[in-house]
C-alpha cells in the first residue's frame, strides 16, 4: 500500500519576491514558511514531509499539505485556520488581530502520552509528530540551533577552560537537522570537534553546506587529524561515519579522553531516530515495519552503552553534558542507574540567559533576497550597539553560515530588545528598505514556552520542572496579543511524555496594525519567560522583571 506521507515526485520550494499567492501577507507568510520547511535545502527527508528530528513533520500527509496550501491561499484576514496534528480541520470567523493559523501537534492526554500509543495513532493516520519548529512552520535549517549551541560551547570554555577553547576538542554524535549545527558552532567557539553519524548522506550534506570541515576515513585518521589541529591551534570539525555507541566505547577502551563530551543523536525517538549497534540502516528500516518493539529495545540497549561510555569519559576528566535529546532517560530505563550524573546543557550553561528572557529569536526574509537579512543584521547592530559578543556572532554568521531555503537569521536577544527589533524591521518594510515582509519567530526552546524536565526546565530551583501550565499560558497570551500563528506541541526534543511547548510567529508587513501586534507579542512572549523564572525564585529574573516593569502580582519587593 502506498504511504500517503511519501511522494517521490514532490519538490517544494517557497515562492520568492513581492507578489502574493494568498490574499494578504498575513496568510502568504505561513504559506511560504510551511513550504520553506520542506525545501530540499532545509528538510531532512522532504519527500516524506520530514523536516528534522527523527520524524518531525510539517504536515500529516501530502493530501493534508495540499489542503493547507489551498486554504491559506483563500483565507480571509478575519478568519483562522485550525490545524490538528498536521491536518487542516476547520476555518472559523475571528477578527483581524487574531492569529491566522492555530496549530496543535502531537498532544496526548498524559496517561497515554507515550511512544507506543503515539505510534499506533500515527500508523492509523490520526496524528503527526511536530517536533518543535517542524510542525509549526518556522524551521530555518541548522542555523536555527547554531547560535544556541555556540553560546553553550562558549560557556563551557568559560567554566572549564578559563575561556580558552583553542587546543581543546569536543566529541559528539548526530549530524541531523539539529546535531548538524554542532561542528560549526564548535569551531566558531574555538574548539575542534569529532562528530559521529551513521548516515553518510548527513555527513555529505554538512560538508556541502560548510557546517563540517572534513571527513575522516576511520577513527585513527580522525584522532590524528585532531592531534595535528591541537598542535597548530586550528579549530576544525571532522565527521566520522560510524555508530556513536561503538565510537564512544572504543575511546574509553583506548584511554582517549576528549575535553568535552555530548550527543545530539535522535535518541528521543528510539524507534525512528537511533541506529542500534551492529545494525545497518537498511536492516533497521526493515525491522521498523516487521518488529518495531525489537528496534526500540535494541536502540535503547545501545544508548545505554553510549551513556555508560559518556559517564566513563566524565570520570576520566571530560566535561560531559546532555544536549537535550533524552538519552540519559533512555539509558536509565535500560538500567544505567547513574545516567543523570552528568548535567543537561540548560541548567549547566543556559539558564541565566533564560532568566532575562534571552533566547533564540529568529527571522526570515520572505523576499528570498539575502540582502534583506544583511540589512536587518545592520539594524540589530545599530539598535544594540554595546554588545560586542552579539556583533561578533552576526559577523561570524554572515561569513560562515550558508542560508538554507529562505534567507534567515538566528540571534539570541531578550525581553529588552525583541520588540524594539521587531518594530524596526516593520518600519524597514514600510519604508521600502526591505523588498518584502519578514516573519519573526523562535524555537520552542525558549525561556517561557516549554516544560521539559529533562531539558529546558531540568533542576528548577523550586522543583517545578514538570509544571506545564507555563507553555499553555505563553500560547494563550500570544494568541491574545495578536500573533500571526501560534502552536502548542507535545514531545519535541525529548520525545513523547517528556515535554510540552509552544511556538509563535508574527509578520512584519509594514502596516501600523502590525506595529501594535508586534509591540504586544514581542514584549509578552519573552516576558512570560522572565515571569516563569521569577516565580521559580531566580534573582536574575526577579531583577529583570522589576527593571522592565513587568506586573507580577506575587513578586515581593
From Swiss-Prot:
Pfam families: Urocanase, Urocanase_C, Urocanase_N. Its cofactor is NAD(+). One of its GO terms (biological process) is L-histidine catabolic process to glutamate and formate. The active site is at 411. Pathway: Amino-acid degradation; L-histidine degradation into L-glutamate; N-formimidoyl-L-glutamate from L-histidine: step 2/3. It is found in: Cytoplasm. Binds 1 NAD(+) per subunit. InterPro entries: Urocanase (IPR055351), Urocanase-like (IPR023637), Urocanase_C (IPR035401), Urocanase_central_sf (IPR038364), Urocanase_CS (IPR023636), Urocanase_N (IPR035400), Urocanase_Rossmann-like (IPR035085), Urocanase_sf (IPR036190). Its EC number is 4.2.1.49. PROSITE patterns: UROCANASE. One of its GO terms (cellular component) is cytoplasm. Signal peptide: none annotated. Keywords: Cytoplasm, Histidine metabolism, Lyase, NAD. It catalyses: 4-imidazolone-5-propanoate = trans-urocanate + H2O. Belongs to the urocanase family. This is Urocanate hydratase. It comes from Hahella chejuensis (strain KCTC 2396).
